[in-house]
Amino acid sequence: MPSAEQTSWVILAGGQASRMGGNDKGLVELTGKAMIEHVIGTLSPQTSSITINANRNQERYSQYGSVFGDNIQDYPGPLGGIHAAIHHLDDEWIGFVPCDCPQLPHDLVERMANACSEDTDIAVAHDGEHIQPVVTLLHRRILPKLEAFLANGDRKIILLYRQCNMITVDFSDQPNAFVNLNTPEELQQFGQTL
């Protein structure tokens, strides 16, 4: 089982943001701050190791921390960022969160790390109704499975997880913590509730 201090965390901001009108979701403003600032604000008290995976606007993202892009072209989705992170970071355990999830749990890192055992490959957050496949903590030993999966042209993240020793981590006490803001309308509605 890793301790929270033995994990590195990556904010996934590498997508095309097609539902956000092509605007980079991590840089879209929510209550006067870039959305990624909300994510960093929640994660930074929990871990000292935060990096950003971005394929566009890397210079802008670099004002928030260390940035790296995908190794695979054509936007393979979150799996591209996961693949790049395993190559970019040396840590055994790497956690991932999306850049468009501004209310992450304040105990995310600790709960995810505590749920893992020696044989866990992937821990995935569960909000009580659904798994949150991009809120995950994984062991780097999944890399061969991930590379074979991507080489086959597969992109559906949950299908990869099913090939691994996956556990779910219960966050049913905080179901609203995983609200993703994918469209300008969702962003506006969410901003009005804060």
Curated annotation (Swiss-Prot):
GO MF terms, alphabetically ordered: GTP binding; metal ion binding; molybdenum cofactor guanylyltransferase activity
Gene Ontology biological process: bis(molybdopterin guanine dinucleotide)molybdenum biosynthetic process
Listed InterPro entries: MobA-like_NTP_Trfase (IPR025877), Molybde_CF_guanTrfase (IPR013482), Nucleotide-diphossugar_trans (IPR029044)
CDD domains xref list: MobA
Group of enzyme by EC: transferase
UniProt-listed Pfam families: NTP_transf_3 (PF12804)
Gene Ontology cellular component terms for the protein in this record: cytoplasm
SUPFAM superfamilies xref list: Nucleotide-diphospho-sugar transferases
Residues where GTP binds: L12, A13, G14, K25, N53, D70, D100
EC number, UniProt record: 2.7.7.77
Protein keywords: Cytoplasm, GTP-binding, Magnesium, Metal-binding, Molybdenum cofactor biosynthesis, Nucleotide-binding, Transferase
Presence of keyword Metal-binding: yes
Functional description taken from the UniProt entry: Transfers a GMP moiety from GTP to Mo-molybdopterin (Mo-MPT) cofactor (Moco or molybdenum cofactor) to form Mo-molybdopterin guanine dinucleotide (Mo-MGD) cofactor.
Assembly information from the UniProt record: Monomer.
UniProt-recorded name of the protein: Molybdenum cofactor guanylyltransferase
Species of provenance: Photobacterium profundum (strain SS9)
